[in-house]
Amino acid sequence: MSKFLLYWFVYGVVCSAAYDILKAPNYFEEFVRQYNKQYDSEYEKLRRYKIFQHNLNDIITKNRNDTAVYKINKFSDLSKDETIAKYTGLSLPLHTQNFCEVVVLDRPPGKGPLEFDWRRFNKITSVKNQGMCGACWAFATLASLESQFAIAHDRLINLSEQQMIDCDSVDVGCEGGLLHTAFEAIISMGGVQIENDYPYESSNNYCRMDPTKFVVGVKQCNRYITIYEEKLKDVLRLAGPIPVAIDASDILNYEQGIIKYCANNGLNHAVLLVGYGVENNVPYWILKNSWGTDWGEQGFFKIQQNVNACGIKNELASTAEIN
């Protein structure tokens, strides 16, 4: 790395970690310019500033107490509840067909490699952006199938989240869904098209799927029960990247590093578990989000292992076998 790039890397980290609450008005005006924010009135702008100030204080506190680094980002003028409501989407479906088999992992975890990352094998597709549509469940589910396809065929493809939003009769589109029910819906539909044939619209629409263009189907799906968080390592290595449910409340302003303190108050978001590692004797999980590459570590984030950070082991992990 050149001295120039190293300087800007260090400068960026220091700046994001060393905010001054007294400079909140300046930060806000820069935020408005950077993200081209448009407010309907001065009253609305003031209201958003107060939310921004509250979030800034939270960022400063996190940077003081956590090993991860947090920064002002595109969510910083939204309340936590607003962001969760607009940019996540894990929720109960209207009904479930229970196609997925429940697998109990009751043996203690065995010994495996200290580090593992599916990205190193080129089995993870690019980070996407769900926008203001509560379809995290579709993004995480299809991200896992994209990886399954890459493992089987040594080729990366992008599947259609819009097909899931429009045609999945089990989940409820941009209003939310679950991981295992998304797999069940794919079994019912018969398969999924690629994104180019059924592009993403970030909103609900009528179903336009073409079964003659399906490229991936689901043969069967499994849901895993275990009291051992570390057992996820075995599933990850043997079955491929895993869509998991988390509480996203404490990751909204994340920039980089290992999150040690993460709320576990209720699952509201779905992401893809792609790997794990150890840094300064702290074991961590690597997860792929669906908030674009301008969030986190180019769209990825890390949380500490074995403390149930963000509630990662609260919900049954789901995987699927493609056909």
Swiss-Prot record:
Positions of the propeptide removed during maturation: 19-112
The reaction(s) this protein catalyses: Endopeptidase of broad specificity, hydrolyzing substrates of both cathepsin L and cathepsin B
PTM annotation, UniProt: Synthesized as an inactive proenzyme and activated by proteolytic removal of the inhibitory propeptide.
Top EC class of this enzyme: hydrolase
UniProt keyword annotations, A-Z: Disulfide bond, Glycoprotein, Hydrolase, Protease, Signal, Thiol protease, Zymogen
Chain segments annotated as transmembrane: none
Disulfide bonds: 133-174, 167-207, 262-310
Glycosylation sites: 158
The protein's Enzyme Commission number: 3.4.22.50
Entries under SMART domains matching the protein: Inhibitor_I29 (SM00848), Pept_C1 (SM00645)
Catalytic residue positions: 136, 269, 289
Signal sequence bounds: 1-18
GO MF term list: cysteine-type peptidase activity
Role played: Cysteine protease that plays an essential role in host liquefaction to facilitate horizontal transmission of the virus. May participate in the degradation of foreign protein expressed by the baculovirus system.
Family affiliation: Belongs to the peptidase C1 family.
PANTHER family: CYSTEINE PROTEASE FAMILY C1-RELATED
Protein name stated in the entry: Viral cathepsin
Organism of this sequence: Epiphyas postvittana nucleopolyhedrovirus
